[in-house]
Amino acid sequence: MTRERLYLYDTTLRDGAQTQGVDFSLEDKGLIAQQLDVLGIDYIEAGYPGANPTDTKLFAAPQKLGLAKLTAFGMTKRPGRSLANDPGFQAVLAAKAPAICLVAKTWDFHVDVALGITPEENLQGIKDSVAAVVASGREALLDCEHFFDGYKANPAY
């Protein structure tokens, strides 16, 4: 058995809310977050500030939890925009959360086809986005979208 600490990250309140027929209210999210905290979850990804009124309101005045870190979810900055000129990124950065998880394209195919930029431009955008979260005094987490597909296609990237 290893002595390294395993951290638990729950996405029920954001990813689970994408299920057809599921629509968490602000109160629902609060009650579920409290129970996840009691269960010992370290990070609770509670939503995507700026994506809908419930998540924006949740992160404007987040509830206090015991040990769990309420985590805001968002995307790295959009290509062709500065951090300051990206409303989506700014909404996530404005969240009053101790941790922010940014999703980033990590498959060079998606970088080319979906983003239309070079791999180097993508990596710089990721670096700049993470640096902005850290500079704001919060913990930055990175969700490497389609990591295994990307690794299979291009391990060097």
Placement of each model-derived feature along the sequence:
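Hydrophobic, small-residue-rich alpha-helical packing segments that form membrane-like cores
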Residues: A61, S82, D86-C101, K105-Y157
